[in-house]
């Protein structure tokens, strides 16, 4: 990136300069235009008919779960299918009771169940119980190892078992060397056998090797799993039909929400007022669908997407346009949190600052109506913290200062934005988002630090080359290379190891007993999953290429054929 001379008219309060040198990033424009502004509502009669079908099918699934009360493996398979098809939220109580029953009888009481000597069944049992927070031991896999402690060679012929064990290993916590070995073993052998497998198992293996289920977005994974599940003769027709109908009903809701947000975003005219910033409303909404897609979180989505667009624009003001003096003024204005600070800002900054206050005032009114006004203190404090972090990074960039890796991370974990986004994600979640829950979050527990680490490390690994080309602050990669005298490849390897540990910390943080209600923990896990998906190969939020467009289209454009 080159510093570009920008006419002073863009900042009319600095009349003593003829031109200002600015670090323009030349971000690509939105690829969507006004694609999502207009939404044609479905015929009410048709929607009502679909909703009736959904209710009937839900009752059928409930009956099937209840009928399998003494058949743990059958229950596990039904639960797994509901989760993979994206409809588990309809059966939270039933699934909770079923898994509790299975845990007590098969683990606490050590009662054998059908398939307890089968790798695929045991791995499924382990994964589903771990996903639900149960501290089941990985010692259950000892029976599949030989006298020397290696996994038996005979397992190489069990592709389904290897796949299920591979998926289970991604729920490991620190100290579980057996699962570390299992991951290496299964990954190696699945890569060897995948070309010899038939559809749909071959497709399942390829997909899992690219995107493990535990790190994927449930809504996105459901789109992929529909065709896989349908291809198996053993699929449950009621489950499949329910999932497709429910997907389309939810898609209509999401499109309606996005249309509303698109009109709001267009009315702000940020694309014109901040042409240097990323215009990413649609990508932001996709991000938020990864945090929660369920209908009961509609208000929460509307809150967080507005704040998300604000912080994305602020990030780019600090990162790709503002001068150091201008940024100091904006930082002070955020700390004061007062409309009276507007007059102290450069002209181009005023629409952003005013919009931030307007968005927060709108949220504050909603919180007041709910009797939850206390939440706004946390939301404002997090905004102040992240803007302070942006300011620190801007100073480093201006001074061409390369901090130590530890100094860098002390700021970069904040600017990764994941404590900020987690805080905002709690605002619309109802009574479970108590003052105690926010205090817990602000105590910076290990799970939130791990989530921040994943966000920061993956961002740096995928975007540092583009950012260094445009004169960005030194990324974690550069800081690590300089401090430890290693190559870029070695730095990436160290970052990968840190990512592995961070995911284990997240898994540990999701185990019982829960420090806060489980749905609040799930927001942290879900936000981390979004990073794994969007930054898996490169920064698809900034550079919206075909893979990202296809993902968005699958959730927000293309309906399921029922």
UniProtKB/Swiss-Prot annotation:
This is Sesquiterpene synthase. Its EC number is 4.2.3.-. It comes from Santalum spicatum (Australian sandalwood). The keyword Metal-binding applies. Gene3D superfamilies: Farnesyl Diphosphate Synthase, Terpene synthase, N-terminal domain. GO terms for biological process: diterpenoid biosynthetic process. Keywords: Lyase, Magnesium, Manganese, Metal-binding. Mg(2+) 1 binds at residues 315, 319. Binds 3 Mg(2+) or Mn(2+) ions per subunit. Catalyzes the formation of beta-elemol, guaiol and bulnesol. Mg(2+) 2 binds at residues 315, 319. It is an enzyme of class 4 (lyase). It holds the Pfam family Terpene_synth. It comes from the Eukaryota. A motif (DDXXD motif) lies at residues 315-319. Mg(2+) 3 binds at residue 467. SUPFAM superfamilies: Terpenoid cyclases/Protein prenyltransferases, Terpenoid synthases. GO terms for molecular function: magnesium ion binding; terpene synthase activity. Its cofactor is Mg(2+); Mn(2+).
């Amino acid at each position: 990136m080159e510093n570009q001379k920008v006419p002073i008219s863009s900042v009319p309060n600095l009349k003593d300069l003829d031109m200002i040198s600015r670090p323009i990033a030349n971000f690509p424009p939105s690829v969507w235009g006004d694609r999502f502004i207009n939404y044609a509502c479905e015929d009410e009669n048709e929607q009502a008919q679909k909703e009736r079908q959904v209710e009937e099918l839900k009752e059928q699934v409930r009956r099937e779960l209840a009928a399998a009360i003494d058949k743990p493996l059958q229950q596990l398979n039904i639960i797994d299918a509901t989760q993979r098809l994206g409809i588990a939220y309809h059966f939270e109580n039933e699934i909770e009771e079923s898994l509790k029953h299975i845990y007590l009888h098969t683990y606490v009481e050590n009662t054998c169940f059908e398939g307890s000597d089968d790798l695929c069944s045991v791995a499924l049992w382990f994964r589903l119980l771990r996903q639900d927070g149960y501290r089941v031991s990985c010692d259950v896999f000892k029976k599949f190892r030989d006298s020397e402690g290696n996994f038996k060679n005979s397992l190489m012929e069990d592709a389904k078992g290897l796949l299920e064990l591979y998926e289970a290993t991604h729920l490991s916590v620190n100290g579980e060397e057996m699962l570390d070995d299992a991951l290496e073993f299964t990954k190696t052998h699945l890569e060897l056998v995948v070309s010899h497998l038939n559809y749909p198992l071959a497709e399942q293996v390829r997909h899992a090797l690219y995107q493990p289920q535990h790190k994927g977005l449930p809504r996105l994974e459901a789109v992929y799993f529909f065709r896989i599940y349908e291809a198996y003769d053993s699929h449950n027709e009621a489950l499949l039909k329910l999932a497709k109908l429910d997907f389309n009903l939810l898609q209509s809701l999401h499109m309606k929400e996005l249309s509303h947000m698109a009109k709001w975003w267009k009315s702000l005219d940020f694309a014109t007022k901040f042409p240097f910033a990323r215009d990413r409303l649609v990508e932001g909404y996709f991000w938020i669908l990864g945090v929660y897609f369920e209908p009961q979180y509609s208000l929460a989505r509307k809150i967080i997407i507005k704040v998300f667009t604000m912080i994305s624009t602020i990030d780019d003001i600090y990162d790709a346009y503002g001068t150091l003096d201008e940024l100091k003024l904006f930082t002070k204005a955020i700390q004061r949190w007062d409309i009276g600070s507007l007059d102290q800002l450069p002209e181009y900054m005023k629409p952003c600052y005013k919009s931030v206050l307007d968005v927060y005032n709108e949220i504050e009114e909603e919180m007041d109506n709910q009797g939850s006004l206390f939440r706004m203190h946390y939301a404002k404090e997090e905004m102040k913290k992240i803007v302070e972090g942006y300011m620190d990074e801007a100073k480093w960039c201006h001074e061409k200062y390369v901090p130590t890796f530890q100094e860098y991370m002390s700021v970069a974990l904040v600017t990764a934005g994941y404590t900020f986004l987690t805080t905002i994600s709690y605002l619309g979640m109802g009574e479970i988002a108590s003052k105690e829950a926010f205090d817990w979050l602000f105590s910076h527990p290990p799970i939130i630090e791990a989530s921040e680490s994943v966000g920061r490390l993956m961002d740096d690994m995928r975007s540092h080359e583009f950012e260094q080309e445009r004169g960005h602050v030194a990324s974690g990669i550069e800081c690590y290379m300089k401090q430890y005298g290693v190559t870029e490849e070695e730095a990436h390897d160290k970052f990968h190891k840190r990512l592995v540990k961070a995911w284990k910390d997240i898994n540990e943080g999701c185990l019982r007993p829960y420090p806060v209600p489980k749905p609040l923990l799930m927001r942290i896990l879900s936000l981390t999953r979004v990073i794994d998906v969007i930054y898996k190969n490169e920064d698809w939020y900034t550079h919206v290429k075909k893979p990202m467009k296809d993902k968005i289209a699958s959730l927000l454009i293309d309906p399921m054929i029922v």
